[in-house]
Amino acid sequence: MKKLTSAQVRRMFLEFFQEKGHAVEPSASLIPVDDPSLLWINSGVATLKKYFDGRIVPENPRICIVPENPRICNAQKSIRTNDIENVGKTARHHTFFEMLGNFSIGDYFKREAIHWAWEFLTSDKWIGFDPERLSVTVHPEDEEAYNIWRNEIGLPEERIIRLEGNFWDIGEGPSGPNTEIFYDRGEAFGNDPNDPELYPGGENDRYLEVWNLVFSQFNHNPDGTYTPLPKKNIDTGMGLERMCSILQDVPTNFETDLFLPIIRATEQIAGERYGEDPDKDVAFKVIADHIRAVTFAIGDGALPSNEGRGYVLRRLLRRAVRYAKHIGIDRPFMYELVPVVGEIMHDYYPEVKEKADFIARVIRTEEERFHETLHEGLAILAEVIEKAKEQGSDVIPGEEAFRLYDTYGFPIELTEEYAAEAGMTVDHAGFEREMERQRERARAARQDVDSMQVQGGVLGDIKDESRFVGYDELVAASTVIAIVKDGRLVEEVKAGEEAQIIVDVTPFYAESGGQIADQGVFESETGTAVVKDVQKAPNGQHLHAIIVERGTVKKGSRYTARVDEAKRMRIVKNHTATHLLHQALKDVLGRHVNQAGSLVAPDRLRFDFTHFGQVKPEELERIEAIVNEQIWKSLPVDIFYKPLEEAKAMGAMALFGEKYGDIVRVVKVGDYSLELCGGCHVPNTSAIGLFKIVSESGIGAGTRRIEAVTGEAAYRFMSEQLAILQEAAQKLKTSPKELNARLDGLFAELKELERENESLAARLAHMEAEHLTRQVKDVNGVPVLAAKVQANDMNQLRAMADDLKQKLGTAVIVLASAQGGKVQLIAAVTDDLVKKGFHAGKLVKEVASRCGGGGGGRPDLAQAGGKDPSKVGEALGYVETWVKSVS
């Protein structure tokens, strides 16, 4: 057996299957594209569904024996978080891992799959395992696989184990038996003859599964029966981390070259050693695992947030930070490990090193935010725990746990952990109810499902070609080839009716890539229809949503299709300006900026992009200036088609989530911008005229948004802004040029008046305090003052309370003011009475509760608020009762 690095194992696997006629499918992004069923890519086959279900035929004619039934292999990065609590506590559980796999869509089957697996594992040219250390499992009814292993490979019967569990089935759809290959690590990992699990396929550390070969040969029907598939498929998976643990002769995956450098770097930060304390080792493993997952996920475009995959990232980071405390790390540090991950993985994933600065910045920001959250959330949680205990409960209400999560970003797992330390539990069912209510609110806020999706079944049957000519022509002669109304195919629609139509030739752009659809009309002597929207149908045709204004629209009839030219011209100006803006953002803010969404409409453009931190006003000015400079340079806009890899090599920006074929459309704006784009553009930047940013804001963690206008809309916007400026200057009796100086003068005057007002208020408060000293009562030998006073804000109340403490020397004081339907309360206790057990925080909390509020604070000074001014007298009356209860 060879001792190989992880990079060598990965490379060797792909080279082996290339020799067997397989095309190497590049590792796809962890974020699924066009697969809403998955939060993350979680297996090697997950990215190949499009091939297995026949939606796409892989292009591999050069090396495939049967071109339409190709052979594929890959090394696919994956994330699974369903066993997150086991990560760090077992030898082989991970959130991020790599699957090496070979696949066949209707080409070879069991014989080749088994023979090639055996060759790769045992040949001295490849892995070189001792065949005596290998065992396999098969399904009891899979005689074909059994006979191949027994009669062709030559495995002895005792090393072929029949297991009922060797059947891959996820419900309706393809399914079939599988065979798993196990490596015997030796007696050091298990030698108890009485252990019922000590066999290949059992729960033990001795026999390690290294490869799973799935033979997809049946279809699981809705009625529960199984029928043979017309084309049989192969789907295999080998975990890289597990294979490396064997080849590098280490006890767990965490000692391989995929993890150990991260652990060593963490040792330097922590000042602790891995391998000396099992509990601390868990922390090292959690950190090493989670930083891999977070680094790759952010590199692929995910960002921490409170929902979906963003919440998974946030949870992983926060779990690692929590475990870091066990090894003495109490500061942001995870970001320092990003370059280590990049160095380990650069052989196959060079993009991690390229994006390391951005990834580290995102992680550091999230870590810093969590340390703040931890401090604030723990204070709130302490109050919640105290309140529950006062009520005699050992359960934190689900509503409170959800408030901590929703308002303060405090993870439910963290709440449960701290609750357990306090001897309490969390009402998890109540938390889930609140979470579901929030989801329902979100669902209700969403727009209805797109009609094309609803009618996908009907549209999916329409195979006729629809040719788009709208790049060059805004008017075309079109024949209607299909009409869909209320989810059914019809022959015609009449005046006043709405429908969707597909035509053979169309100049109307279908909404995609952020550019909204064209509008316009279909017209002929027999009828006119207004085009309201255009979307892509499942088979790629342009689907026009129309309302018939006059006459009828019939299938097979010919119409003149006419795009609204004025709207299209405004759209193309905004689209080309969006490309200029994208490049300008990279130039000013950094190469980490990536498009996160866009809208190109006739009246404006909206551009969402990844960037942590605020965009400074001077940066925004520079971005706007750069875009206008490119417009005024009159740069030509050239559009051409290139092979995808050649376009990327030229530096063309490919946008995440967009699907590209082998040949792509490249939009080149002078020498300034180069992007892959299927949208419509101006022929020259001078046609845009003017670019003006209207707003810039944050729309989520690490995501910013710019809205802008161009051309006539930019001119109108600037004219409106100038009119507002002139009106403001007129009201202040100055000119627009002198407006700033005039405002500076007014602010200085206002500040002086505020100082005078504060001085006057302080004198009045002093006078009122003098008057209040006459209202002090003796309660069991304790001077008590509880009074309603006039005060503008809490600062005045506090100043009054401090003054009274000075004047009285010893006293319990509660002051209340009521304004605008709200109550403000302050409680003060002199130091001598604090020593006797009087507590301002507890007192003000009781008083506030009697006028519909709450609060608290220190023993000597505390404040609170209330919602019912009518109860102030009653609340103040309680002060004497409280003092009696303490004294």
UniProtKB/Swiss-Prot annotation:
Presence of keyword Metal-binding? yes
Q: Which SMART domains match?
A: tRNA_SAD
**Reaction catalysed by this chain?**
tRNA(Ala) + L-alanine + ATP = L-alanyl-tRNA(Ala) + AMP + diphosphate
UniProt cross-references to PROSITE patterns, sorted A to Z? AA_TRNA_LIGASE_II_ALA
Let me see what the UniProt entry remarks about domains. Consists of three domains; the N-terminal catalytic domain, the editing domain and the C-terminal C-Ala domain. The editing domain removes incorrectly charged amino acids, while the C-Ala domain, along with tRNA(Ala), serves as a bridge to cooperatively bring together the editing and aminoacylation centers thus stimulating deacylation of misacylated tRNAs.
Q: Per its database record, what is this protein's job?
A: Catalyzes the attachment of alanine to tRNA(Ala) in a two-step reaction: alanine is first activated by ATP to form Ala-AMP and then transferred to the acceptor end of tRNA(Ala). Also edits incorrectly charged Ser-tRNA(Ala) and Gly-tRNA(Ala) via its editing domain.
- Protein name, please? Alanine--tRNA ligase
